Amino acid sequence: DSFIKNLLLDNLLLVDIYNRAKKLHIDADVRRAVMILELQQEKDHSSMESVKSFFGGKSKDFITAVDEKSIIIVKELEEGEGYADLDKLSHAILDTLGLNQNEETHIAYGTIVNELKEVSRSYKEARMALDVGKIFFGEKDVIAYSSLGIGRLIYQLPIPLCKMFIKEIFENKSPDDFDEETLVTIDKFFENSLNVSETSRQLYIHRNTLVYRLDKLQKSTGLDLRVFEDAITFKIALMVVRYMKYMETLEY
């Protein structure tokens, strides 16, 4: 177990990884991915045991922990198994353990790696996926590093740069100043790929009402969401604001 922990945390020299793996009869060149199950409350002995029994004590998968709130699974993949299987497995773990959506429980997984020395990278990716997932995909309980999209980019931006970007876009206004109605309208409009008719239908409002709201928004921000480029700028700005807010909560 200490070998796996040190491997995950990148505490081992390359030569040590292979020497110790050999001694412990751990195959070095097998496809693996790291999954992190994060529980809302501190994990108790039973949740760790449940995960272990879910995997049926298969000696090829390693289950461990490096902190109070998460359980780490280093999963070995069979030939032909891929991300779809990791996704299925993640949902199965949540279902089996009764960790359904009402608890703030998430599973994230990193990319599939081919060598033992790469396992720490998959672990770092799964960690990042958990964070990025909390900021941008709060409603998802399974998060894949490979599907973080633009959220992963934003997550790596320094806060001063974010503040500068928001100031340039909104000048003295902040997206937080928009009322609930405006924010719902914007979300729906993006959801429907900037389609005015479809958005107004889903919001149960007249097309002209939606056009009026978009015009009003354009007046206050200088951005016309019907124009693709402006819509992208606005979408990224909203995501940047969410990221900044999340980072603020961590500081307190």
Question: Which ranges hold each PLM region?
Answer:
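Signal-transmission linkers at sensory-effector interfaces
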Residues: 1-2
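Cytosolic nucleotide-utilizing catalytic cores of signal-transduction proteins
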Residues: 6, 10-252
